[in-house]
Amino acid sequence: MFKYIGDIVKGTGTQLRSLVMVFGHGFRKRDTLQYPEEPVYLPPRYRGRIVLTRDPDGEERCVACNLCAVACPVGCISLQKAETEDGRWYPDFFRINFSRCIFCGLCEEACPTTAIQLTPDFEMAEFKRQDLVYEKEDLLISGPGKNPDYNFYRVAGMAIAGKPKGSAQNEAEPINVKSLLP
């Protein structure tokens, strides 16, 4: 009999403790954000959707070197190289499957031209998986992104069609490395 009364008192105490806890949570700051109405705080280095940027001249920065596709651990990037009349490389097609992408940022680190950049955009929900495959036209933005003054071909140099190397203005003659051998 005493055990029965003790169990009732213990159960009542548990219920009262739960009510006090629920009542106390009603006056505290909420832990949950009402997402669409309230903006979400993103850290400065947040890695979201991938974009392709342009150089200061307005051309595509991507030179189709394929380093991003090799660095991708899940293989969600595919591209094919093409060449313009002046010898500049560009991707004929550039495709990213965002249903496989883990947003690790290795493609951004591997890119020598800073063409691939990760943005803080994370709202990419789709009803069909095929809609998560982005083509080059979907990825290209109109601006230079994080590095506005960098132009890969200005830094790396590019041969001018019809002229031998070393004959351009302010350019030194190329060194024949085979003549340096003993």
Swiss-Prot record:
The species this protein was found in: Pseudomonas fluorescens (strain ATCC BAA-477 / NRRL B-23932 / Pf-5)
Family: Belongs to the complex I 23 kDa subunit family.
Protein name: NADH-quinone oxidoreductase subunit I
Tagged with keyword Metal-binding: yes
Role played: NDH-1 shuttles electrons from NADH, via FMN and iron-sulfur (Fe-S) centers, to quinones in the respiratory chain. The immediate electron acceptor for the enzyme in this species is believed to be ubiquinone. Couples the redox reaction to proton translocation (for every two electrons transferred, four hydrogen ions are translocated across the cytoplasmic membrane), and thus conserves the redox energy in a proton gradient.
GO MF annotation: an example: 4 iron, 4 sulfur cluster binding
Catalytic activity entry: a quinone + NADH + 5 H(+)(in) = a quinol + NAD(+) + 4 H(+)(out)
Subcellular location: Cell inner membrane
